[in-house]
Amino acid sequence: MTVLIHVLGSDIPHHNRTVLRFFNDALAATSEHAREFMVVGKDDGLSDSCPALSVQFFPGKKSLAEAVIAKAKANRQQRFFFHGQFNPTLWLALLSGGIKPSQFFWHIWGADLYELSSGLRYKLFYPLRRLAQKRVGCVFATRGDLSFFAKTHPKVRGELLFFPTRMDPSLNTMANDRQREGKMTILVGNSGDRSNEHIAALRAVHQQFGDTVKVVVPMGYPPNNEAYIEEVRQAGLELFSEENLQILSEKLEFDAYLALLRQCDLGYFIFARQQGIGTLCLLIQAGIPCVLNRENPFWQDMTEQHLPVLFTTDDLNEDIVREAQRQLASVDKNTIAFFSPNYLQGWQRALAIAAREVA
């Protein structure tokens, strides 16, 4: 029997590590289709920390893509589960027949679905990728991304699936012991990546609240980002007093990040696509409402779970934020579909579909 091979086709250390550890801890023991991985990037101790997995590492996107294509051609019964897909060579292989639709299962990670880059090479590549996406055997995604994808690819099968955010279910009630009063603290963005549009977000927060709130901007990831961090800092200081602007340039450990989130009253995310689901989950778990761009389709997932959603186009003030906090506090967080461990059932079904164990 041919087992499913999982492909992490781009060197995104934080996300790749999260996926590997999730499979090692939650899926590998019960499914032989959850153990084989091909990954772009360095081992960096991952093999030792994920002993239940067989992981082959590749130095770059092209070398991984060539190995995947060779396996696909050598055995047309071999199926691949692509976690995110930031690898142009693999899309072109799907388009040209190097990888067949019946071999290609794709978990959409948000950024790889949208066409937001303005560079010439991206504009030339996007139409080809769009054609290739019509040939995917099955896509797995959030409700919002499934809806977005279906507008252009209505004939491709879609199944609901959520990124396996690292969460401690015992913390679902942690918001209940905190009194929220006084100056509000607003988290802006989920990382230091430029896709967060930090400067535009800071301006939007200032337009809504002025210099009456404290703004926290986590920018410790990705590394080697000092020039952009300084650019954001200078733009922020033109809007907010020094005491109201906190730019975090060092990467935080998980527990420290959780502690930071618990100090916040609101999350503010201006990007016009689904991303940062991990931060959104942790904020919601802590009873902290989020402001989303109306173009970010994850609002559909939130409303489906009866969670309050605020939009960047809303007229916001402290009373509205406090009311959203009150509504969020009344939600039974143990029932939220994209929380741990509830998303596990979706992953078990996704493996069964990709391995052709269920129709």
UniProtKB/Swiss-Prot annotation:
It catalyses: beta-D-ManNAcA-(1->4)-alpha-D-GlcNAc-di-trans,octa-cis-undecaprenyl diphosphate + dTDP-4-acetamido-4,6-dideoxy-alpha-D-galactose = alpha-D-FucNAc4-(1->4)-beta-D-ManNAcA-(1->4)-D-GlcNAc-undecaprenyl diphosphate + dTDP + H(+). GO terms for cellular component: plasma membrane. It is a peripheral membrane protein. InterPro entries: WecF (IPR009993). Its EC number is 2.4.1.325. Pathway: Bacterial outer membrane biogenesis; enterobacterial common antigen biosynthesis. Its main location: membrane. Belongs to the glycosyltransferase 56 family. The keyword Acyltransferase does not apply. Signal peptide: none annotated. Catalyzes the synthesis of Und-PP-GlcNAc-ManNAcA-Fuc4NAc (Lipid III), the third lipid-linked intermediate involved in ECA synthesis. Pfam families: Glyco_transf_56. GO terms for molecular function: 4-acetamido-4,6-dideoxy-D-galactose transferase activity; fucosyltransferase activity. This is TDP-N-acetylfucosamine:lipid II N-acetylfucosaminyltransferase. Keywords: Cell inner membrane, Cell membrane, Glycosyltransferase, Membrane, Transferase. It is found in: Cell inner membrane.
